[in-house]
Amino acid sequence: MIFRSIFKKFSTEEEETKKKSVAKTNSFWFILISASSFLIYSLFHKKRLLGTATA
């Protein structure tokens, strides 16, 4: 906590804005990759269940 307050004291407004922008971009990519991974897993899992039921 001490280091955070010291760092924040010396960081400029531009750096803070850049950090927030990078954080939003990282959040977007995390959500996108998580959602697509879940969809792919769901499709393969469903396909595997259907394949074993018919075999």
UniProtKB/Swiss-Prot annotation:
Its keywords, alphabetically, are: Membrane, Transmembrane, Transmembrane helix
Which residues span the membrane?
Answer: 27-44
Could you give one GO CC term from the UniProt record?
membrane
The superkingdom of the source organism is Eukaryota
Q: How does it sit in the membrane?
A: Single-pass membrane protein
Where found in the cell? Membrane
What is the protein name stated in its UniProt record?
A: Uncharacterized transmembrane protein DDB_G0292078
Native source organism of the sequence: Dictyostelium discoideum (Social amoeba)
